[in-house]
Amino acid sequence: MKKLGILNRDIARVLASLGHTDQIVIADCGLPIPSNVECIDLSIRLGVPNFVDVLTEVLADMEVELMMAATEVRTESPSIHQELENRQISIRYLPHDELKAETSKAKAIIRTGECAPYANVILRAGVIF
């Protein structure tokens, strides 16, 4: 049995398969999921698990060179915005509609139970060397 890191087998598999510049998404429970992208649905009920907890665990296991978030998160969900800013990773902000379009390029979308507005982030894989 695995002792450390992410126990969810689907998330662990996706993270292990990422190459440089591949993307995954951590999403709130309302983000539309493109039909061509794998959805790893963690949602149990509204708010569980929350966006920040999932983001924290994924970032502990993944080298990220860039995060992409909706411009609207700055004003509509300031606490989520602050959590993103606290990560010391470059962030590119784009309008929510553009962010949604960009999710079709992701290897997977991890759906949380988060219900804060615009609590979505695209993580672009970096390299560990």
Swiss-Prot record:
Compartments reported by the entry: Cytoplasm
Any one GO BP annotation for this protein: D-ribose catabolic process
Keyword match Lipid metabolism: no
Keyword Cytoplasm appears in the UniProt entry: yes
Any one GO molecular function term: D-ribose pyranase activity
Key words of the record: Carbohydrate metabolism, Cytoplasm, Isomerase
Coiled coil: none
Reaction(s) catalysed by this chain's protein: beta-D-ribopyranose = beta-D-ribofuranose
Top EC group: isomerase
Family: Belongs to the RbsD / FucU family. RbsD subfamily.
Subunit structure: Homodecamer.
Protein name (record): D-ribose pyranase
UniProt source species: Shouchella clausii (strain KSM-K16) (Alkalihalobacillus clausii)
